[in-house]
């Protein structure tokens, strides 16, 4: 059995505190995880719910048969892109060492992430008095000045994936440290801006047929005009046909302290793929806000505004990992909105009310009571969002988005204005 001591290094704690022990072993070919809270953590922080699948009591707790790692730790794991990098590194090492390729578990992925750039506020040790894992000074997040090399490396890795061959070791080595701490499928890496702030760089994919990075930046600016709290973004051109998107990490303070983050997926105890087809939707997030958040009214209004915006621009890639929360001394609160992109879809991936996922602003208005929003307030929010979205062509022109791409989304934007 392998074990890690879990520490909370949250920005509002005076110092890092032991949360508990995470254990892992492979039983009869299946991954098994266990977690035990530190008794002092439970005494001091009894009101904090870290994950739906971990209860606040002192006994050892186990994941359900067939389940993966506990939800609160899965939020710190890489998604498709980061896992691809780690898998290819393992294949390259196995080839060099003339051994069989070792299958990687979520525990392996957790062990492989750089401490500095890991999402959220958890840190891990193998020994109580030892150092945190993966804090080697040789592991450094590259500065923004190296972005061109990172873009090139990501394209070389994508090229090798297309050709079903292993990438050169140098490309993996360049991306493995900054690129494995982040979720999502697109090529990306962590970088430091000129002020030393930790940022996410999303690179153009070789598969892109439009400027996805520029449209995501557009969506964030438009959402900000609609009164939504958003992650700060900007774009870099001149690195290829399309733009690279930069997004400032919102789980770090100006002093680089860690703000703990959790996805609505882990806080609700859901899994990848839970969406409207399974009866899941925005009202599940409403339930969590009512039960687990501080500033309940403010968070409910913010969520309602985001749903209205998603409907108006067709942001339908809206899974539970794309709605996050930050932990404050008073409780959870919605994180800034992120990963917003227009699509041509006329249905949301989430139910808007109890039964419909049709992207119709009137369905949202008629469901205002389910969001605990008075109808008059709901009308005001929707009008403010529509007023902002109606300016979309002006903003797109200002950002020099090509007319061909603007024409692609024009009719979709009209649907709910």
Please name every model-derived segment.
Residues 1-320, 324-417:
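Phosphate/dinucleotide-binding and metal-coordinating scaffold of catalytic cores
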């Amino acid at each position: 059995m392998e074990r890690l001591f879990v520490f909370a290094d949250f920005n509002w704690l005076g110092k890092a505190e032991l949360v508990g022990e995470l254990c892992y072993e492979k039983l009869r070919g299946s991954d098994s995880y266990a977690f035990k809270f530190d008794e002092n953590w439970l005494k001091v922080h009894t009101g904090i719910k870290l994950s739906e699948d971990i209860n606040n009591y002192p006994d050892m707790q186990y994941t359900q048969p067939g389940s993966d790692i506990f939800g609160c730790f899965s939020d710190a794991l890489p998604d498709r892109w980061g896992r691809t990098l780690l898998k290819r590194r393992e294949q390259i090492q196995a080839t060099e060492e003339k051994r069989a390729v070792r299958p990687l578990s979520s525990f392996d992925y957790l062990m492989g992430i750089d401490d500095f750039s890991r999402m959220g506020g958890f840190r891990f040790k193998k020994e109580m008095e030892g150092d945190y894992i993966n804090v080697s000074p040789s592991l450094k997040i590259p500065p923004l000045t190296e972005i061109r090399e990172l873009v090139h490396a990501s394209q070389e890795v994508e090229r090798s994936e297309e050709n079903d061959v292993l990438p050169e070791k140098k490309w993996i080595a360049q991306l493995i440290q900054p690129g494995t701490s982040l979720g999502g499928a697109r090529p990306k890496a962590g970088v430091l801006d000129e002020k030393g702030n930790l940022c996410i760089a999303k690179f153009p994919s070789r598969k892109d047929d439009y400027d996805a990075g520029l449209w995501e930046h557009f969506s964030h600016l438009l959402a900000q005009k609609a009164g939504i709290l958003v992650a700060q973004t900007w774009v870099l051109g001149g690195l290829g046909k399309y733009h690279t998107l930069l997004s400032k990490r919102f789980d770090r303070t100006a002093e680089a302290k860690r703000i703990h983050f959790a996805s609505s997926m882990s806080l609700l105890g859901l899994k990848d793929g839970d969406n409207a087809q399974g009866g899941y939707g925005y009202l599940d997030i409403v339930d969590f806000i009512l039960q687990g958040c501080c500033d309940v009214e403010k968070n409910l209004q913010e969520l309602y505004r985001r749903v209205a915006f998603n409907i108006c621009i067709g942001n339908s890639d809206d899974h539970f990992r794309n709605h996050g929360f930050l932990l404050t001394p008073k409780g959870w609160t919605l994180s800034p909105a992120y990963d917003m992109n227009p699509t041509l879809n006329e249905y949301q991936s989430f139910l808007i009310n109890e039964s419909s996922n049709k992207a119709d602003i009137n369905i949202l208005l008629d469901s205002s009571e389910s969001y605990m929003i008075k109808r008059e307030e709901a009308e005001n929010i929707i009008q403010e969002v529509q007023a902002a979205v109606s300016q979309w062509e002006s903003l797109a022109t200002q950002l020099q988005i090509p007319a061909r791409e603007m024409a692609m989304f024009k009719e979709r934007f009209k649907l709910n204005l």
